[in-house]
Amino acid sequence: MASSLAAQLSQIAAKSTNQLDLKAQRIAHSQSLIFDRKVASIQDFDTVYQICYEGFQELCQLDSRFTAFERTIFSEQSKAEDRTQLTAAQNKELDVALEAFLALVGGRLLLNPAIKAVEWLVRRFRIHEYNTSFTILTFLPYYTTPLFLNLLAILPEDLTPTFKVLIPYKKSSINPPRHPLVHSATTNKPFLAALNSYVLQVSRQQAHHHALLAFWAGVYTEAVAGMLDASRSGRREIEKQKHEDIVISVLPILNDGFAMKNVSELIIGCYMVSVVLAQKASLQDKVLDSLMEAVAGSWTEETVESGLVCLAVLAQQKPETKLPRRALKAILRLDDIFKRLTELATQYKTSHLLLGVVAGCLDDLPRQKDTARLDLLSQIFQNQLLGEPEMSKAMALVLEATSSVHKDGAMSLDAQARLADLVQVFSQSESLRPTFQKTIAESSFDIAALEHNLQTVIDTAPAPRTVEDVEMEDVEKEEEQDHFSSTVESLSGEKLFKGSFLSTQSIPLFEKLAQAFTLAIGSKEKCQTFSDLAALGKNEAEKSPQYLSFFIRVFSGPYSMGTRVTALNMITSFLTSTESTNLDFQALLPFLLVTLTDPSERVRREAAAALAAVGSLYKKNRKGEDIWARDNLYGQPKDIKWLPTRDAQKVFERAVLPSLEECIFDATHIGKVLENTLRGVSVDANASELKKPLRLAFFTFLCSHAIELPLFTPKLGLLNILNRIDKAGGTTRTKELEPLLKTWRGFSEREVQDICEKERVPVSDVERQMVAIVTPKEKDSIMILLSNVSSHSESLRPSFIAAVFGRIKDIWARVAEDRQTVAAEQLFDISLGLSDLPLVNNSRDLLRSVQLPGSVLAQFLERIPVSLTDMEALGPAPKRRRTSQNNMIAMTVKDEAEFGKVMEKMTFILELVDSSSPETHPELADGLFQTLAALHHFKSQIQSGMSYLLSLTLGSLLAIVNRSKESAKAQFDTSVIRADLVVDCVRTTESPQVQNAALLLVAGLSVIAPELVLHSVMPIFTFMGSSVLRKDDDYSVSVIDQTIDQVVPALIQSLRDQKRDVVSGTSELLLSFTAAFEHIPSHRRLRLFHALITKLGTQDFLFAVLAMLANRYAMDKDVLVLMTGLVSDASAPVELTTYSKFLGLVSDSLKPKPGISQVLLGIGSDDGREPQKVAVDLLRDLAYLFKHSSLKVKMAKTFASEDEEAIRQLRSTFSQILEQVLTIGDSVQSMKLVSQANGDVLAALFGTLTLVDFLDTIEVLLERPNDELRRKVLRLLEGRLRQNPERDSASQIRVLDFLPTLVDIIRNSTDILLKHAAVACIDRIAEKYGKKDPSRVIGAAQVVASEACIGQTDDRIRIMGVLCLASMAETLGQVMIPALPEALSRSLALLELSLEEGKENSRLHDAVFSLFSALFVHIPYMISGPHLDKILLLSFKSANAEECEDDSRQEALKMMARKVDMAATLGAVDRNWQYAVQAGPVATKETLEVVSLAVEKHPKSATGKNIGVLSSILFKAFDLRREQLALGANATFDAADVDETEDALNDVTIKMIYKLNDTTFRPIFTKMLDWATSGLPKKDTQGSLARLTAFYKFLQVFFGTLQSIVTGYASYIIESVVSVLGKASPADKSTKALWLATMRLLRNAFEHDQDEFWQSPSHLNQISTPLINQLAHATNSSTAATVIAEAVPAITELAVAADSTDNHKELNTALMKFLRPSAGPNGKPAGGENPHTRLAALKAEQSLTEQLGEEWLALLPEMLPYISELMEDEDENVEREVRKWVKQIENVLGEKLDDMLT
């Protein structure tokens, strides 16, 4: 304790800065860089400052940046600074200044002024103590100088671990050598991190210097190299992980370094580190690409040479030659690039870099604007910068680019000429020709296609010489032979490959074999040697896929033409030589069909030969259906839709073989053949048509291969063929191949690149073919494509998105217009997203590039007013003609970002319209005028000209109008024209373009619609309607007010003086105002119209204004709001009078010769609307006014007043209105829409009444003879009661008083629909008011249950009545009992009727069961046993009725099980069980569900009381299996049904057991055992087996569920189980189920033994031997699998339960019998004679070893002899498994068994 305290005190003392410690202060003051300690100790700060300040001033003269420190650390005040007295914040601020100075002075430390200046920092601010790290790093580049020794001398003794490398040299006072510093950087992470951080900080401060950066670059490069070398490990995974950790730590430093382009030496240092990383670490392509882009992006003129060297080194490490795009662009932008590359190539390895440049020069040839890249390409080849192998690759790149250039677009003539010249150089140059000819020979380029693309002739390699000519090549051939021999020898040890070579993309063995096969090309002997390799399994080729799948992969893969031809030849040879004529080789068909599209004729010829060989095999095949490689062609079994052999033969003989000759000469012919074949058209004269089912099968066969094929080269070829076929045999390409598209979509960019790189297929080709899966003939083709990108856009590859949109563009024109509309809407919504997303840009580009239908453009235009409405509260009403536009209130758009989005959206829409030839879409006129109105309105709000948008809008309108002028009649509805807006555009805009467009548009409009532009018959109101009314400035408002006040009264008076009808006389005036409605600012509309009507006279004119507005705008929301406001201002009598006149106008409009309606509404005029449509609009608006005006409130107030006259007048007018409505209803019964609208008015009119008044009115109306009216009013009553009717006492009493009226209708009416309506009303009344006085409702219930209602023959009244009774049962409860007898009997009869065959009625069925459910819930005690029996019998019948839904029946049965007394429920089930079984599985399972619920939901006591009937049901159910077997072919249950039923039964039984105690259940169990074992005569073997199976399946659940609680019950069944084990067998179909049940029940019984039951010898001895003897059943692969799966786990669990060495030994002894062949007592083979038996025994030993471990291996000595024998077993499977067992034993014991086994 004391020593610890002393140590702590000494540490505190060492760090103390107590000012009283004078000795410590003197020592600290004497620390100096330039003075001796003694001299320094006697100097004061004034002296030191004077000396140091001189040095500082000299520094300032050298670099003006130092002057900034004159005011801080070199100020006069600094002499008094004491760091010990400063706060932490002040010290931190001081540290910033000190470090900035040190960074700046670091490059001049060898100068005396700099040392003097730093001396001040040491003496005054003690930087060596407080800023130790920064100080050391500043001096470190000078580690070899005396100056660094001086620094070491004054550094603190306790240096941090970061700088521990300096401690020995500080103590020894010597300069550190370089090696320790590099070693420290390599091994001491903090030191390296500090150095890197310091260098980056100094560089950012622009204080870098040569000494520092040279030191850092050397140390850091060596450190990184050292770290990578030190991380090398024998285990590749560990080494890779360590390398990744180092790379992750280095990359951020490089990233920061590359960002400082102007620090050249830092950049070069980063290049050095990058080179080390590339050479010593296995960097991924992605990392290399990023480094190369960073290097190329960082160089300047000073660093470009070093950067190119770095790029060359990095490129050499890349497996592929392609350079990153940014790096390539940076290279190509360099001046004198060829000169630079030439100089680079003379000093460094540049082959990959140059190949990358070559590939880059060839990239995207059609889009190259000039030939600069091709010029560079020519220079590279002509100066032969590449070696021969790389030259060949470069030539191949040129040829490949030239071959595929036509796919990407046309090449410019200059580019074509340059490439042609270059290829001519290849073929004519003496030095390049051999390489070029070799390249041609080893590749599969189509020379004819090359010549066509380049428009030149290519001299290919000469024909190979004969063997006699080749004498000088013997040595080379021998070397090749040696290479082949060594390769084959290395492969000779390979065992047969497990599976198919087509199973996955990456198979190392395949690569080795392919290399060997390539070496064998050209030599039959070598090919024969190669084909005999064990890994290929030629001898097993007919049974296993290895041999043929290898050659399939070769000829389908990216190999040279010769290699592929030889592979095809090997397959053909095999097919022609095979002796098995019953094999079906249809698996070859997809690959060979793809090969027929190969550009090489040689390849196609060999493919045709192979197909012919397959065809000949089909002819020999007489009976075989054995498809080669059916389950393992692609590894694990795949969902391949194989063709039946005869169908495959038909495909060959009718479609493929007749066209082979043409396919050889034409690579495209096979595509045409398949297309026509699958369409059902014969393309060849010798071919015959395939029937539709076969076409479908063939098509799905090919599609399934395309989906499941793991290799993308043949997959791409197959897609290329399939994508020609839209439909086949009733299915579509999209439907079949869409899973492939979804799978491809899910790949990441890296995965796609890896896939395509491995198989050398262009990513773009795969992307294009994948999206081409979607055919335009698919109904939702575009939406399918969009669904693949829209919801996953952030995670998808840009290339996939581009391909999808490219496909949409390709198929757009072939898609139906309605589908284009839906797609365009979605594309537009996508295009409004963030503009930098690929999905958004692609959507916009697509919309701009396709032909959009007019309907789509119209919908887009509709969005503009809506968008502007969202931006500000004063939005224009869409789709309405305006007549004025001013008087807007200025507003400010607060959200500028939102405004920008709206502007962008509008601009995009209008640009789309403008670019879509608007003159061809006259229907856009309406939307464009709306847009013009919205823009003009919004323009005034934001005080902006919006000239561009106006110009676009006017331009589109002008195009439409000009096109319309050319025809006799306008091509669009001229009523949408807004000439006032166009004029205002001229008046208000400052843009000449807009003005000119507007003037031209006005001129055009005057031609096609002069009445809208020129003066009308009432100039003043025309002017107001088209101009003034829409203004919103004060002056315009004043004009309107004065006009109304002065002109209108005079006009009215004039009409009266002339004795003209004032309403008809002012129709033009009213029309002007109503026409101007939508142009009037919304906040002024009500005030303006109210003033107008007031001046005209409300009682005389209100109806007319309302009618004209309704006629013109129908149900426009804004108009309805105005109309409601106008009528709400009127009194109740005036409002009712207005409605009466309004209805009179409706009646007039429907007359043959209309009167006033012709004047006001234009009825009967040439341009007037149809009277019925006018009537519908007027009636709908009137219904709205009744519902939403304040009439009801005003009438209530009048009725509540004491003004009798007013009340009388009101009732009179209301009655008149009602009479008018009824009269109209009578007259328009034949006019459906008018009648419906009139009915709405009637309903709304009644809605103005209280419920009491409503019922009073209905009673009167029900006395009318019109049944339609009576039905109508009852439906209105039901609707009102369905909502929230009045609940006051008076209303309730009145409603209940109304019940007798409804009952009377049900009893006496013959109109079924009227009865239906009455029952519906009773239903509502009973639900809403029944509980108020149930006794008044019961009478109605009895009538509904009687003959008069549900006793009718009409199903509608029956269903309504039954549902009404169900509602009443829920509401009335036991009060319902008087109606119950008749209700039950009739409903059961109805249910039975609804289930009659041919007369099924699901609605009636469901209604009756709903009634039963209600009765079971609310009065279950009233349902008697016979009723329950009847319900169950009918439910059984319902279960089998296909037309009936299950839900209602099942719900009723559940309610019965839950609510009805358990004894009654179980009794009914027991009585009717046999009928349930007769009905079938569904009824039986539902019956068991009833029992299950009854047991579950009732208490234990109820279960105990009813155990007798419950047992009876269970025994009957357990006997189901036996009964069904006895029925034989007449059985109603199949095996699966029986199993499912028994599962449900076992569940019920377990639930019952949970409710019983052991005393109650044990007798039942013994009874069950007796029932199962001895309950049948011995002769009934089949029945006994069935009962045992059912019982044992129950025991399996019994022991598995109740576990250790019931282990003791096993004593009852041991004898029976042993007996069963002696006679049941998994190989015997009749006993297999029993055997499986036995194994599983034993396993469960053993597994849960916690009472040592099975340890008892009496129990163990009985069961062990019979159980282990089950291994003898393993006599073939099928039974062995069953035994291993079922018996082995049971044996294992028995051993675990036995849990004693003696027991284990006994078990093992019995088990080992089966490990070796032996003879039984009767001389017959026994034990392990069969290898499958031995295998099963081995599996048991493995399981026991795994489960018991060392406990079981205590028996190892007696096992060893068996193991030794088994390791030499003649059966491979046994031998393999015993070796697994040996490894397992060795893992458990931790030692080898080799010594024990020898």
Curated annotation (Swiss-Prot):
Disulphide bonds in the chain: none
One BP term from GO: positive regulation of transcription by RNA polymerase I
Major site of localization recorded for this protein: nucleus
Bilayer topology term: Multi-pass membrane protein
Purpose of the protein: Involved in nucleolar processing of pre-18S ribosomal RNA. Involved in ribosome biosynthesis.
Quaternary structure, from the entry: Component of the ribosomal small subunit (SSU) processome.
Family: Belongs to the HEATR1/UTP10 family.
Listed name of the protein: U3 small nucleolar RNA-associated protein 10
Organism whose genome encodes this protein: Aspergillus fumigatus (strain ATCC MYA-4609 / CBS 101355 / FGSC A1100 / Af293)
Lineage, highest ranks first: Eukaryota, Fungi, Dikarya, Ascomycota, Pezizomycotina
Encoding gene, per UniProt annotation: utp10
